[in-house]
Amino acid sequence: MKKIFLIVIFLIGLSVNAQTSKELVGKWQLVKWTKKGKEKSIQEYYKTDQVYQVFKENGDFESLVGEETHKAKWKLSKDNAELTIILVIMPVKFSVDYFDANKRIITTPQMGTFEYKKVTE
């Protein structure tokens, strides 16, 4: 269950101004986590600051936490307002607060708000 929560934390939705799933494809690093208005420590929670999400064109998804890799599938709603990550048979939905080619901000009621930056491999 903790691993599912780790994956859920990395999941981030997309929306705003005709952004497409093509812009989501790539590697994204978690740079900020806020819950109930307070910034949380990525390093303390994950035991590393190397926390990434990788979105592939074929719908494959990888959550990378340090040396751990968790695989899933992803899909973006037609209006780009919701990102769904499918973990085995359990879909996890994220709303999108902000998304452009280099930055994503998503929020989930359980874990808070996550900000990611796009990185080159």
Regions picked out by a protein language model, each given a short descriptive name:
Residues 16-121:
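Lipid interaction determinants
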Residues 1-4, 19:
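Positively charged n-region of N-terminal signal peptides that target proteins for export
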